[in-house]
Amino acid sequence: MRFIHIADVHLGMQPDAGFPWSEERGEAIWESFRRIIRLAGREKTDFLLIAGDLFQCQPLLRELKEVNDLFASIPETIVVLIAGNHDYVKRESFYRGFDWADNVVMLLSPEPECVEVPEKKTAVYGCSYDKKEILENRLDGVRPEGKMKYHLLLAHGGDARHMPWNPGRMAQAGFDYIACGHIHKPGILIPDKMAYAGALEPTDETQLGPHGYIRGTVDEHGTRIQFVPFARYEYEDLVLNVTEDLTQYALETKLKQELALREDCLLYTSPSPRDPKT
């Protein structure tokens, strides 16, 4: 069984608000999401797991319809998603009662629930946020059950105000893989067992380095996962060694030369200032 795990897509967000490229960044988020859908379709991936915050805020009905059409375009892939703290399921949310495509399952309940997919021999567990902050780990005590061969868990949180959890304890629950969201930096918490996919595209200048998705396989030999860089944009610290006698013109020239050596889709941040004599 093969899966793609994404999280924190934040559709509708325009990073770097106020800058000339902000609108382009917002469109890049949508385009990266479309690209991941096309990838899942080409590879006939069994599952697309979305571990919360697909949207930056409460989704509009037209946005849900757009996303649903994309999901429907990959009928051989089962899409399972939960809502996170940004797109939580409030009482008047359009998530409630939405008619998803046949290959889509949203685990809408604020309490842990499970969907079984017999043709994939897989059960997927998880719960959605019903408010911005959840101070307890609602997934504590959830264990695989039933007759399915493989068991996956979707989890959004991991900090003090968003379902705080102990990765080691969760990994001992018996799931084949725990797909995490909320933290935007990709990271393997437990090798081949539990990971943050990170934001599909970086959403601010603090999120340095590659962003993308987790690719995984579960079979009789166990679970194997790997992080795959996929984002169009990447933030990178750019450090220039300058002296106190460097003029503004010389500094700008030096900066342009450095930028010319790098890729177009890298976004640069300025780290903490250093002593100009160094």
Describe each PLM feature range.
Residues F47, C57-T217:
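His/Asp/Glu-rich metal-coordinating catalytic cores
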Residues M1-E66:
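N-terminal active-site segment of His-dependent metallophosphoesterases
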